[in-house]
């Protein structure tokens, strides 16, 4: 499985490198340290002929701002809805060389072992950033805990918000909080 992810990333990187093959300078790619920078560094290791400089992102650094300013040539960390949201926020348009894997998202609870034990009016913490909030809502829908407006069909291409919930049979309370706070909130939510 890990090899498949590296292979997929290699294909995606090859696509993005195709247009830069004539450039003399290294291709500078911004990436989160794990797993994206690890994948890029693995690719560099298996193909040393690639002139690739991996720029690892630190907390608070926006890779799209780096791309817009020319500090990097490409970035590798986001899915299409996040990219579209960033284009609006930055007033820029970026080219997509290839789409790649999306990090998994899960549902966790310290209080309940399965979805059927989730009580009426349970509080569910979700990330408050646009794209991960949408992914969380699609995940809740996949477990039949809510239903989104039918116009939201694909989490890879559309962004849903709590306003787009059309059915909520358990009357879940959706609590939007900062992503790093979610693990700390598990004792306070359902």
Q: What feature does the model see in each segment?
A:
Residues 1-5:
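N-terminal secretory signal peptides that target proteins for export/translocation
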Residues 7-18:
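Bacterial N-terminal signal peptides
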Residues 18-24:
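Sec/Tat signal peptide C-region and signal peptidase I cleavage site
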Residues 30-53, 62, 66:
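Short, polar/charged alpha-helical segment
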Residues 46, 61-75, 88, 137-139, ...:
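Short helices/loops that flank or line small-molecule/ion binding pockets
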Residues 51-59, 149-158, 171-178:
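Short beta-strand-to-loop elements that line the ligand-binding cleft
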Residues 92-101, 173-175:
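Short beta-strand->loop
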Residues 97-147:
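A conserved helix-loop-strand patch within extracytoplasmic ligand-binding domains
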């Amino acid at each position: 499985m890990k090899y498949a992810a590296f292979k997929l990333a290699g294909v995606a990187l090859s696509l993005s490198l195709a247009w830069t093959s004539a450039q003399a300078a290294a291709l500078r790619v911004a990436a989160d340290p794990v797993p994206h920078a690890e994948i890029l560094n693995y690719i560099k290791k298996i193909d040393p002929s690639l002139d690739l400089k991996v720029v690892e992102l630190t907390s608070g650094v926006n890779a799209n701002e780096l791309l817009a300013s020319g500090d990097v040539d490409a970035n590798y960390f986001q899915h299409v809805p996040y990219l579209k949201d960033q284009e609006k926020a930055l007033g820029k348009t970026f080219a997509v060389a290839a789409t790649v894997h999306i990090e998994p998202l899960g549902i966790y609870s310290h209080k309940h072992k399965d979805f059927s034990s989730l009580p009426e009016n349970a509080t569910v913490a979700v990330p408050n950033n646009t794209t991960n909030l949408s992914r969380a809502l699609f995940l809740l829908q996949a477990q039949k805990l809510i239903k989104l407006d039918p116009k939201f069909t694909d989490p890879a291409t559309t962004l849903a918000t709590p306003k787009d919930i059309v059915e909520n049979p358990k009357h879940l309370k959706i609590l939007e909080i900062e992503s790093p706070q979610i693990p700390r909130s598990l004792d306070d939510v359902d």
